[in-house]
């Protein structure tokens, strides 16, 4: 777990001070988009691992919603705001950002509750599949296929 959190923190630091934010150009745009994609994927991976542990230990879903509200991904949402994304980034990256917000359970508590009322085996399979998908994106540094 600590490995993924460390990776997230490293990516956030690179994004915060990235030259693209101060003087956008075609040369630094590609690197910034790659970093953004890695940050989104890393955050999703970290969240899905947390969910897997919660499913295994049957922890309180409300407690998890509170955890998500104060987690690293909220910091990412504050750092990478929609105006910045639409102004500087390609539309595919903005779509990834929107998907990321939609997939964040505290935005939609009903979706979260529906997920947690699903049969245990179905939940575990879904989480394992999600974890593998996001892990692959983190390693490749690319977009979701």
Curated annotation (Swiss-Prot):
Major localisation: virion
UniProt-annotated location(s): Virion
Induction, per UniProt: Expressed in the late phase of the viral replicative cycle.
Keywords from the UniProt entry: Late protein, Virion
One GO location term (cellular component): virion component
Family that this chain belongs to: Belongs to the asfivirus K145R family.
Protein name: Uncharacterized protein K145R
The species this protein was found in: African swine fever virus (isolate Tick/Malawi/Lil 20-1/1983)
């Amino acid at each position: 777990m600590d490995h993924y959190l460390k990776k997230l923190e490293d990516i956030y630091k690179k994004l915060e001070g990235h030259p693209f934010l101060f003087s956008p150009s075609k040369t630094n745009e590609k690197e910034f988009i790659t970093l953004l994609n890695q940050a989104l994927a890393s955050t999703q991976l970290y969240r899905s691992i947390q969910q897997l542990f919660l499913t295994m230990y049957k922890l309180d879903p409300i407690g998890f919603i509170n955890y998500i509200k104060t987690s690293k991904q909220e910091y990412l949402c504050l750092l990478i705001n929609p105006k910045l994304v639409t102004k500087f980034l390609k539309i595919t990256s903005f779509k990834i950002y929107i998907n990321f917000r939609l997939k964040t359970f505290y935005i939609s508590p009903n979706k979260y509750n529906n997920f947690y009322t699903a049969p245990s085996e179905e939940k575990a399979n879904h989480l394992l599949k999600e974890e593998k998908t996001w892990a692959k994106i983190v390693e490749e540094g690319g977009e979701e296929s």
